[in-house]
């Protein structure tokens, strides 16, 4: 149960990082 919580938290962190990184790249290409 505890390991699942860590996995979910890490997954959300990576998803947020990937989304923000993609947004920055998209914004630069847009400009």
UniProtKB/Swiss-Prot annotation:
Subcellular location field: Plastid, Chloroplast thylakoid membrane
One function term, GO molecular function aspect: electron transporter, transferring electrons within cytochrome b6/f complex of photosystem II activity
Transmembrane annotation, as ranges: 5-25
One Gene Ontology cellular component: cytochrome b6f complex
UniProt keyword list: Chloroplast, Electron transport, Membrane, Photosynthesis, Plastid, Thylakoid, Transmembrane, Transmembrane helix, Transport
GO BP field: cytochrome complex assembly; photosynthesis
Membrane in keyword set: yes
UniProt similarity note: Belongs to the PetN family.
Assembly and interaction partners: The 4 large subunits of the cytochrome b6-f complex are cytochrome b6, subunit IV (17 kDa polypeptide, PetD), cytochrome f and the Rieske protein, while the 4 small subunits are PetG, PetL, PetM and PetN. The complex functions as a dimer.
The protein's name: Cytochrome b6-f complex subunit 8
Protein's gene: petN
